[in-house]
Amino acid sequence: MRRRTMLGLAAAVGTAAATPSLLTAAPAGATHRPWCEEYTSLGGGLHPVHVLRVGAPAARQVLVLVAGQFGAAGSLRMLARELAGRLPGTQVWAVDRRETNLADLSGLRGNDPDRAADRYLAGRYRSVSAASAPYVAGWGLATALTDLRRVVRAARAGGRRVVLGGHSWGATTALAYAAWDFAGRPGYRDLTGLVLIDGGVHDAFAGEGDVYRVTPEQARAGLADIAAGTVFDPSLTMGRTETYAILQLLAGRYAVAAPDAPSTLAGRLPAPLRPPGPVSNAGLLRSEYVDAPLVPDLSVNPAYTSIATVARTLAAARPGAFEWYWPQRLTLDLSAADPFARTATTDLLGLRLCHPTAIDVPLYSFQTGLTHGTANAAARWVVAHSRISSASYDGDDAMTHLDALWADRNPMLRTLVPFLRRLEP
């Protein structure tokens, strides 16, 4: 999801614990046993980072995936399962950033969506604000990459190889990691490959209408706004910062529990989400994601992604599909990092993007119809302005931004799986 698009939406509407390790049967298409799917903490003191690990525990390669703006590890579960099921030598780790710990999931105990809806829609949960969490003002790209390096180092344990990838601004984050200077060590030296899914740097989102040129003056103004209390990105705000994520979680749970039952949630939604007439629980998701999506970023093409898959993805809470709170400082820093070079603005913000031209690991880029060709064009620019000697590009213009992650039959696998297989030890 993109910042500028989400701002238009905002104008229109005015701590997680680790789960036990699960050794289960592999999904259809998998060629190996045992199959591990676990959500666990990698530490980090008061603000731990969590990962969803999917695939063979003995795999010698790990693909670390980062979600985009407002995206969480649960949004990557479907893709992680599909990849790990086809690649016996690769385990997939989907990252949950530290801000996911801020969500109050206590109202989701049990499987009663009516009870959960009554609690959350009445505001009977712990809502986080700038006053209660002022420390989030400092959670920018440096913090995100420090946390991500903890994940990468854990993935590298025992001599495993690590490929780093991401979706949307998660792809931007992956490239920033590769170019980052970690106390004299370039980030790309931790990696054996990069995977960019419908995102990146250097005008990757220009085809959608998003071009980022943050001047030093704009950066100073952004920092001042954060210091004045705009700690959380307001792009998805519907009354409260977290309301949109909560509503999607509830809609998913209703659709999983009783897809054909009349939706009691629909009439309680804010106007931009409310369908024009009565719908079923599954019909509410179709209205939101197919018939009348808020923005192109938040849509699916039913030729690729079924409403049942949308429901299952949204219904999960730990990990969930959406972050409840996105740090405004991270929005500012990722926007400023888009030129993928050291600038006066990156210096002002303390962004250590010192090694973009030295990156030398294989790169994969996939684009959907969202960016009208600019995602792959931007990836080609990165390759042309670095030491990358091997790159693969693919795309499907009929797919949406979310289809790349949630598709039941994902065309991206035809080229991403061979790319990752070539990198396996």
Spans of features found by a protein language model:
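Conserved loop-alpha-helix segment in the C-terminal half of the alpha/beta-hydrolase fold
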Residues: 365-393
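Alpha/beta-hydrolase
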Residues: 205-361, 369-370
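Short, surface-exposed "cap/lid" segments of acyl-processing enzymes
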Residues: 56-110
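N-terminal cap/lid segment of alpha/beta-hydrolase-fold proteins
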Residues: 31-50, 54
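Alpha/beta-hydrolase active-site loop
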Residues: 113-155
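N-terminal export signals
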Residues: 5-25
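Gly/Ala-rich beta-loop-alpha elbow adjacent to hydrolase catalytic centers
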Residues: 166-170, 174
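Catalytic active-site module of serine/aspartate enzymes centered on a nucleophile-bearing elbow/loop
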Residues: 388-425
